[in-house]
């Protein structure tokens, strides 16, 4: 860049040299002669100086004044108006950079001064705390030293001096009390001003009780002989200290709070959110993001709830739903010597086959002679003594209680006596009894009754029961057949001997020294005594005063009665008793357990009551024909259980044969119960226990059965055409099989030429040889009848027009998605996948 002198610059700006030198000197430049060189930065400095001197900085004013004028009109009655003008004026001053810098420096100095003051304050507080600590230690040391000296002095003085030392402190309080009594006499009279002044000064002072409750803060003692009551007297700092002591505050958590979430087998979304201390909507939103749309009351399984809780950053503790039951089972200790117990026998049979007569004869013959004749049976269970031991009988008419016990898993019966009339043969109710006994897995002793009648035919009984898989011992089976006569008493001893022989084979054991455990046979609500339950003690000993847990009920045994209505104090194994004191009537088949205390009994009972509704709802869907696939999906071979009732024997046998023949290696039909006649309450109980469907062929259900079906949600169907039953069962089995995927070939096109398209790549010019070619369907490319590619038909055109389908004998252009290796001579096969239901 060329050098410019002061003289040349004066010529450029058309200014005399002397004036330019004067202006440059005012601008602070060192130039004094016309020959000196002027640099660009010096030119800029001169220009800035000239602008300032000529007033150009006024374009950036340092002070701005704003004026605002507002005019409003007010009405003053009638047509008169008053104009009100409001003027506002504001001035804004722009500070220079030097002022801003000075302000910032002042703020920094003030901040440093404040920090220094805080530091000094903290040091003073620390020094004060150290002084307090040292003073406290010195005081404790002095107190300990004084105590030691006092102990040493007391030990050295004789007993007389000790008496004087004791008497002196006693005398001092007496003198003090005397002075206190005299002081009120010397108190001068107070006027109202004194009282008002005292109230003003003492209204905020804490009382003695308040001072005892709130301990005074530790401070360095001012003087050793000055007593302090913890209240600051005088000074302006007392009020602020009181406020500071009563201050409350909340600190935000510095990090996420991790909670321990207890998750059972099932948990609702609301319960899960409550355990994590978050809103239920947050959990619902989180599960929506996971791809699981749920509601706030929806029940989650354990795995899903565990995943949600862990994703939200909480610890998970898996809890067993039956934890209380497991703890209860562990607390029950059945320790002691096991002894042989009496068998529990249930007598079953058809109504007219002499079951009641046989029971009456056994009771008359085996109960003590002094009690015979006027016996009143209070409960449906009793025990008799024989020469070979004791036998306990359960009277379960209609088999309702027996089926209910089996449904709840309570094996209350050891042996079943099946009473069959020799002159009548095997009847429908006899078949039901056999089905119940086999389902419970207990041995059967057959009593062929009415053997004294001329028309008796025992061989017919054996043939009929052999058809039900009850094989006599003479034929190589395991069921003893005993001919008896309930009228004459013939064969009763042999029957009891056969029962006791079966009991010896079963090796029934019990521990009398253990806490009582049993099962409920029946229960009722007595008007004068409240809930009364008939309990069969199976193990241990039940005593009066024991706390018992029975199903969802509990209570203390206030009284126990035997089968004759006499009060007893305790009952051993295989003894039936009536107990009083429960808080409700338990169901037949509920398990009775003696627990240690009432707290544990109440806790388990409430837990069972909570689960009762869930179990009932789950069981309501168990027997639905439509839900068979979900209910039995875990089994290797799916089974459809059926309880079948028909009007005549021929129809029943035909249906049983046809239904049993259905099925294959994956599914099967099992007729768990069948008979001739209407659907009874016993059939409904059997279907409930066996998870079966009730079928009635030309028969209907009675009131008791309908009540159970409605209460438990069983599936019951009526038919009058035999083929309808077979067709419905086939459909159910087909639904259990699932479905298959089948491929149908829609059409085949042969590639005649290949074109190139910038959009689709290789386009095959084809002739449809078979069927019909559809767009957006899966295809296969075959070369020499070998599949070389499988994909989707992307483009289908005919004469440059997109078409949905092309029939056989027509030409078309085909674009295959993501495939460009099409050659002349290839075949394109278009197919579809169809879901086909499997059939038997």
UniProtKB/Swiss-Prot annotation:
Gene Ontology CC terms: cytoplasm; cytosol
Positions of region (Disordered): 95-155, 173-256
SUPFAM superfamilies per the UniProt record, alphabetical: Initiation factor IF2/eIF5b, domain 3, P-loop containing nucleoside triphosphate hydrolases, Putative DNA-binding domain, Translation proteins
Compartments, as annotated in UniProt: Cytoplasm
Region annotation (G2) ranges: 374-378
Highest taxon of source: Bacteria
List of residues binding GTP: 349-356, 395-399, 449-452
Region (G5), start-end ranges: 485-487
Main localization category: cytoplasm
Keywords on record: Cytoplasm, GTP-binding, Initiation factor, Nucleotide-binding, Protein biosynthesis
GO MF annotation terms: GTP binding; GTPase activity; translation initiation factor activity
Record function comment: One of the essential components for the initiation of protein synthesis. Protects formylmethionyl-tRNA from spontaneous hydrolysis and promotes its binding to the 30S ribosomal subunits. Also involved in the hydrolysis of GTP during the formation of the 70S ribosomal complex.
Stated name of the protein: Translation initiation factor IF-2
UniProt source species: Pseudomonas aeruginosa (strain ATCC 15692 / DSM 22644 / CIP 104116 / JCM 14847 / LMG 12228 / 1C / PRS 101 / PAO1)
């Amino acid at each position: 860049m060329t050098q410019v002198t002061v003289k040349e610059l004066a010529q450029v700006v058309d200014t005399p040299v002397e004036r330019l030198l004067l202006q440059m000197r005012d601008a602070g430049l060192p130039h004094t002669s016309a020959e000196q060189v002027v640099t660009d930065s010096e030119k800029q400095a001169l220009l800035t100086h000239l602008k300032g001197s000529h007033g150009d900085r006024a374009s950036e004013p340092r002070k701005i004044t704003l004026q605002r004028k507002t005019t409003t009109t007010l009405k003053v009655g009638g047509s008169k108006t008053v104009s009100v003008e409001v003027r506002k004026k504001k001035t804004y001053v722009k500070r220079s950079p030097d002022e801003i810098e000075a302000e910032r420096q002042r703020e920094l100095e003030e901040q440093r001064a404040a920090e220094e003051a805080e530091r000094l304050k903290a040091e003073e507080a620390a020094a004060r705390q150290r002084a307090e600590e040292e003073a406290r230690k010195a005081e404790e040391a002095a107190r300990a030293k004084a105590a030691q000296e006092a102990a040493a002095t007391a030990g050295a003085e004789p007993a007389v001096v000790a008496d004087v030392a004791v008497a002196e402190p006693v005398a001092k309080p007496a003198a003090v009390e005397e002075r206190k009594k005299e002081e009120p006499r010397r108190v001068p009279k107070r006027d109202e001003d004194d009282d008002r002044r005292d109230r003003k000064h003492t209204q905020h002072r804490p009382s003695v009780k308040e001072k005892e409750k709130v301990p005074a803060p530790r401070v360095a003692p001012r003087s050793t002989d000055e007593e302090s009551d913890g209240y600051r007297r005088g000074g302006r700092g007392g009020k602020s200290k009181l406020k500071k002591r009563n201050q409350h505050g909340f600190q935000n958590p510095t990090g996420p709070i991790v909670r321990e979430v207890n998750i059972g087998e099932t948990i609702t979304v609301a319960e899960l959110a409550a355990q994590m201390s978050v809103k239920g909507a947050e959990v619902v939103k989180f599960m929506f993001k996971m791809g699981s749309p749920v509601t706030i009351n929806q029940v989650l399984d354990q795995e899903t709830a565990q995943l949600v809780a862990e994703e939200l950053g909480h610890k998970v503790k898996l809890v067993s739903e039956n934890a209380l039951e497991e703890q209860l089972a562990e607390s029950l200790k059945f320790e002691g010597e096991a002894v042989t117990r009496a068998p529990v026998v249930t007598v079953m049979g058809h109504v007219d086959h002499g079951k009641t007569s046989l029971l009456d004869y056994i009771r008359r013959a085996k109960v003590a002679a002094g009690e015979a004749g006027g016996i009143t049976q209070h409960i449906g269970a009793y025990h008799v003594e024989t020469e070979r031991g004791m036998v306990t009988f359960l009277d379960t008419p209609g088999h309702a209680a027996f089926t209910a016990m089996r449904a709840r898993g309570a094996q209350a019966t050891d042996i079943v006596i099946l009473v069959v009339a020799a002159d009548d043969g095997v009847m429908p109710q006899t078949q039901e009894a056999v089905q119940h006994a086999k389902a419970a897995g207990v041995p059967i002793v057959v009593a062929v009754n009415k053997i004294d009648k001329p028309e008796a035919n025992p061989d017919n009984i054996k043939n009929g029961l052999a058809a039900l898989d009850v094989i006599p011992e003479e034929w190589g089976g395991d069921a003893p057949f005993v001919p008896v006569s309930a009228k004459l008493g013939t064969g009763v001893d042999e029957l009891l001997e056969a029962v006791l022989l079966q009991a010896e084979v079963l090796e029934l054991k019990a521990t009398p020294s253990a806490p009582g455990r049993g099962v409920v046979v029946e229960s009722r609500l007595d008007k004068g005594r409240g809930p009364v339950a008939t309990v069969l003690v199976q193990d241990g000993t039940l005593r009066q005063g024991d706390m018992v847990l029975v199903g969802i009920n509990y209570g203390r045994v206030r009284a126990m009665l035997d089968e004759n209505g006499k009060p007893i104090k305790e009952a051993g194994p295989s003894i039936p008793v009536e107990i009083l004191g429960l808080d409700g009537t338990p169901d037949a088949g509920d398990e009775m357990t003696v627990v240690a205390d009432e707290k544990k009994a109440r806790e388990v009972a409430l837990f069972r009551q909570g689960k009762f509704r869930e179990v009932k709802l789950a069981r309501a869907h168990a027997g639905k024909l439509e839900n068979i696939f979900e209910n039995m999906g875990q089994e290797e071979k799916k089974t459809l259980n059926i309880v079948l009732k028909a009007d005549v024997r021929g129809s029943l046998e035909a249906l049983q044969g046809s239904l049993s023949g259905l099925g294959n290696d994956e599914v099967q039909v099992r007729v768990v119960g069948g008979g001739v006649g209407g659907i009874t309450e016993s059939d409904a109980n059997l279907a409930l226990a066996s998870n079966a469907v009730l079928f009635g062929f030309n028969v209907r259900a009675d009131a008791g059965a309908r009540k159970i079906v409605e209460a438990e949600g069983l599936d019951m169907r009526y038919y009058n055409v035999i083929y309808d039953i077979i067709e419905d069962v086939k459909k159910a089995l087909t639904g259990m099989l699932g479905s298959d995927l089948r491929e149908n070939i829609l059409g085949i096109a042969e590639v005649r030429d290949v074109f190139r398209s910038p959009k689709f790549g290789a386009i095959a010019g084809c002739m449809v040889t078979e069927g019909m070619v559809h767009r957006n369907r899966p295809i296969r490319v075959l070369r020499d009848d070998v599949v070389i590619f499988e994909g989707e038909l992307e483009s289908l055109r005919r004469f440059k027009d997109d078409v949905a389908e092309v029939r056989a004998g027509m030409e078309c252009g085909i674009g295959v998605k993501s495939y460009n290796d099409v050659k002349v001579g290839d075949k394109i096969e278009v197919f579809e996948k169809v879901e086909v239901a499997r059939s038997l």
